[in-house]
Each structure stands twice: as structure tokens, then as C-alpha cells.
Amino acid sequence: IRTENIEKNTHDNPFGAVLSFRGTVTDTTLSHPLAATVIELTDTFPVPDAKAFGVGQWWTVQVAPVEGGGRDERELQKLVEITEIVDATHVRIGYLNGWELAAGRTLTWTRVEPVRNSHVRNMVFEGAGPDEYTGSHPVSFEYAVGCDVSGIHATGTFWPVVMRRWCTRFRTEDCSLKNPPTVEYGGAGYLTQQIYCLYGRVADCTTSNVRHLNDLTASAYCTVVNCHGDGDDAGGNPFTTHGQYEHDLLFDGNSGLMDIANSGAQWGISAKRLTVRRHVCSWFVANTKITDLTLEDVTVIARPTFDQAGTLTVNADGAQVRGCTAKTFAVAQRSARSTRPTTVSDCSFDLPAGGVLVQTPVTAPVHFVRCTFTGVDGAVLRGAGPVRLTDCTVTGAEDAAPLSVGSADLTIDGGRYENTGIELSAVRDQRITVTGGVRLTGRNRAGALLGRAAGPGKVTWDLTGLSSTTDTATAHVRIADGTNHYLATGNRFTGGTLHLVPGALASALHTACVEDGTKRVAMPDDGTTARTEGNLIL
């Protein structure tokens, strides 16, 4: 299909497609405030009078915007089927609600006669002009149920090749888009966009030089499988969600830049239970109000033509990051809705010098398990929340600065740290626990494998089962500033020095340690607040 000299479209109208399918919106509308909370994952909704509804009817249902939030910030906007009249004031719908709705929020129901089972297949489409008026695109669906698209291969379309809004149960498969006229105009240059959609599958699609391959906006229970976007250097990211309270989405086996829930506060920058598996890209950002994000086998490879940092960023709100690889990794926090921990396990990161690993706003606990960090030079863990590193391997760059840690509670349990170290920022009261056979080796620019800055915070040190080996110019532990409570039992120090300034120690217990060729540069005398006997000095 070619569309030269096609009739001009109207302003901002992505539904002005060559093939446009639109259901009928009736005049039947009901609005009512909720008398009680509508819980998450329910399919039973209160209504003023269930007699107004019939089983098998289709209705749009939406909640009023969040009070004090963005203009379009709504947790619920879906096209749903009435599946049962429960009682005089409740109906059951074909959708399990993704977000709790508080009492007092207003729901609006509108009856719709949707387009049903209209399919478009096997089309080669060439777009027309370069703007919203002269451009063209193949197909749009609005208020549609069970309408599938397959085998559309488009070039140069302005609006999305497949545009959907208020759609339920659909497939978009084996479609492609190359070289739209713009990737800078919002809403244009997409292969497919879904707004207020349910139960969709996008599969086996490809794009080149587009804004988005797939955009899911205020949608739920959808999958995106085996889709691949290249030419994503010039302003487009193939995979995105709008951040309008999307939930329960799966991305599996795709490639291309990914940016989740990041269209702006107007829509809420929120999403929940998004899972990304076996994904390859050079930039992956998910640092807005994304709750219970799951990443498995995501590989981010730095590319000189786009993000040379190879960035992967997540929100510390129930994120589970497993088996992932990136150059730059950062944990942010914009929300605190989850009940599950934020855990990063079996991952590999090659951190840039001075990079912030845990950002300032992070107050949630963050747990790194069996992770490998290379090229570390002054990486910063700035947030106040607890940080735990279990069996991690951290390798510093040449003449590297130690990790700078602001966490109020840092636990290092096992693992190996080579040519790096820990310096507590002491911007607040802090506790550091080193246990589980941690091995520290090498040296760093600060001249201390474990130390603290001269901040105002009180630091509590608990070192047990540590093995530390270094040269004569480097301290295993250096405590020279502030107020400190120090405990070291059952540790092995080889070479190096111990620098424990008495005036900086409110209490000290250093016992049952092996000091093999280690010089005590400073050490408190035994007394009521200090005990240093019972060590093996070799």
C-alpha cells in the first residue's frame, strides 16, 4: 500500500489511520465515589445499581486522578467485560485490579459496543509525508476486543504503525517499521503503542531507527517477546512504558534500549511487577516509582555511539536483579510500596571512577549477593539505608580510592576485596560489620583498607573472622577521627599497620587476633574502656 497525496489528517490524531476500527461509546455513564477501599487483585467492584449492568456487556472503567498528583495520574483505565452480577451493588469484571483504590475515590463507568475480532494481516505499507498532517500509517483500534495484527511491514510512517487504545485481548506479531520521518515528536515514530490495554501480546517484531518499537501506557497483563530494535542511537528507545500505573508486564528475549515508566509526573511515573528476561541493550533505565521490578539475564554493553557508560539503573522498591551485566550500575529510590527486599545477585559490573552505586535518596535495605565489581575507584554508596554485601568480589583499579560508604548499617559477609577498601563517610552515625571470612588484599590510594572520614557521625566497628593482607605503607584499619566504638575478634592481619588512635576510641576490644608482621602505629592502652590483650603477635 502506498499513500501519496492521501487526505490530510487532523491535529494530534494517531487514530486517523488508513484502516481505523473504533467501537461505539454509548450515552450510558455512571459515576460514584467508593464507599470502601477496593483492594488490589480483586475482580469484584462496587456499583451504585447492578441492574444497570448485564453479563457480557463491555464497559470502560476509570478512576479520578490522584488527589495532589499529576493531571492524568490514574491507577485504573481499562475496557472490561461484565462477567457476573454478584449482588445489587457489586459486579464482577474480567480483570484483576492492579492497584488499591482508596475510599472516596470516584469511579466512572461508560458502556461501550466494541469492535470485535477484526484482524489485519499481510501488508507492506509505505508512509506518505513527514508531519502529522501529511503523514500516514496503516491501522488503529479503539474500543476493540480480540483484534489482531500480523505481517505488517512499514516504512516511513508518522504515527504508530499499529495504534491501540481501550483494547482487550489482542496480538501484534511479525510486524516491522523502518525509518519513520521523526523520532523527536512525542507519540510519533512508533511501531506499536497500547494505551489502557489488557491481555496483549507483541511478538517477533523488529524496528530500525524508530522512537519506540513498543510502548505500553496504563496497560496490564501484556507480554513482549522476541522483538528487536536497532538504530536506537538517535533519540529512540525501542522498549518503554509510560509510567501511568502499568502492572504485570513481561518482556522476554528482546534487544534494544529500554526506559521504563519515565514519561513524567503528569502520569504518575509509576509501575508495578514488571519482569524483563534475557534482554540485551546498551542502556537500561528503571529508576522511577517502579515497584517489584524483576530483571533476569539483562546485559548492558556500553556503546560509543550512545551511552558510553553502559548504564543500568533500578529503583530500590522491591527490585530483584539476577544474573545481569553492565558497566555502570546504580540503585535509586523514588518509592517505597513493596514488601519484598531489593536484592542484586550474581551480577557483574565494571564501575566507572567515582560512580555512585547507591544514590542519596536510598533508605531501603539493599543486598548484593555474589556480585563481581571490577575497575572500582572511589565508588560511592551514599544512601543512608542498610547495605549488605554477601560473598562479593570487588577489584580496584590501579591506585584506586576506596569505596565511600554513607550507609547507616554496612555489613560485609564473606567475599574478596582486592586493591580497594572501605571508607565510611561519617556523615551520620554508622555501623560496619565485617564477618564471614572476608579477605582484604592489596592497597589503595587512601592508605587504609578500612577507615573513616572526619565526619560528625559516631561509628561502631564490628570485625570478626577477617583476613587482611597488605604492605607496610597501608593500614588494615585506620581510626583517627571522630567518636568510635571498635571491636575486632578472631581476625588475621598480615603485614601492614594498625592505626587506632586512642583519642578517637570511646571503646575498644582487640583480642584473639593474629598479627603477622603487622606494626601497631597507634593502639590504646588497656583500661576501663579498652582491652587489647590475648592476641598472637608474630
Where are these regions (language model features)?
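Short aromatic-glycine motifs in intrinsically disordered, low-complexity regions
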Residues: V66-R74, T106-R111, L381, L403-S404, ...
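Autoprocessing Asn-cyclization modules and mimics
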Residues: E4-G94, E100
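All-beta strand scaffolds that present successive hydrophobic residues in beta-strands
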Residues: I1-R2, H119-R121, C147-G151, F170-D174, ...
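Cys-His-centered catalytic/binding microenvironment captured across papain-like cysteine peptidases
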Residues: E73-Q77, H90-E142, I195, I269, ...
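Short glycine/acidic-rich loop motifs that flank beta-strands on beta-rich extracellular proteins
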Residues: G129-H137, T157-M163, P180-L191, G200, ...
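Extracellular beta-strand-rich, repetitive "passenger/adhesive" scaffolds
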Residues: T26-V38, M123, I152, C205, ...
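Right-handed parallel beta-helix
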Residues: Q57-V86, R121-Y221
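Short loop/beta submotifs within extracellular cysteine-rich repeat domains
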Residues: E67-G68, W99-A102, D232, M258-D259
